[in-house]
Curated annotation (Swiss-Prot):
Name of this protein: Cytidylate kinase
Location(s) in or outside the cell: Cytoplasm
Lineage: Bacteria, Pseudomonadati, Pseudomonadota, Gammaproteobacteria, Pseudomonadales
Pfam families attached to this UniProt entry: Cytidylate_kin
Ligand binding (ATP): 12-20
Amino acid sequence: MNIKAPVITIDGPSGSGKGTIAGILAKRLGWCLLDSGALYRLLAFAARNHGVDLTNEESLKLLAAHLDVQFVGATEGHPQRIILEGDDVTDDLRNEQVGSWASQVAALPAVRDALLQRQRAFQEPPGLVADGRDMGTVVFPEAPLKIFLTASAEERARRRYLQLKGKVDGVSLSSLLDEIRARDERDTQRAVAPLKPAADAIQLDSTELSIEQVLERIMSEIAIRDIAG
């Protein structure tokens, strides 16, 4: 790892707001951004497109090593776009079904190992904000600041419902709550890199906090550690 490029990790369960927080934080700091969940979603989406069984560990490992993917950085008024094999699949990856597939493939040790170096390659100057589920425990264990962001399952389902309402047909709050609870169980119980806070992580419960309040707390921790210079 490049010791000249500091890393801030933001881990947490599905719907905790870590992606939103990480994106805003990276923009404020002028740092690189790693959405590790997108890599797993990309792999699951590509596997389905290529007819690869989501339980076939060796085939998924091979596919992970050769993913033709580009991340087009966010600009003013335009979010980051994700290009897979020449096609913009950003919106496809936010589908709840793709998220469920991603949770399945993320439980496979060979898949996590194949994507590990791809994730670490994002660590470049002036710094990196990395969001995911094992950023602070496995991918960047030496990061000077680790955040574990959570919220109640009910609040996370409510947030996801508001995101999807009007965009996805047939979405319901109860079904989203069931899916979040199922993903929590898969993510925390998997044998390799289970979802858990790093021993030195700062745990933030965002159930009753606004986005700005969470950001203020993180910026305070950055200042205390003098991470961003």
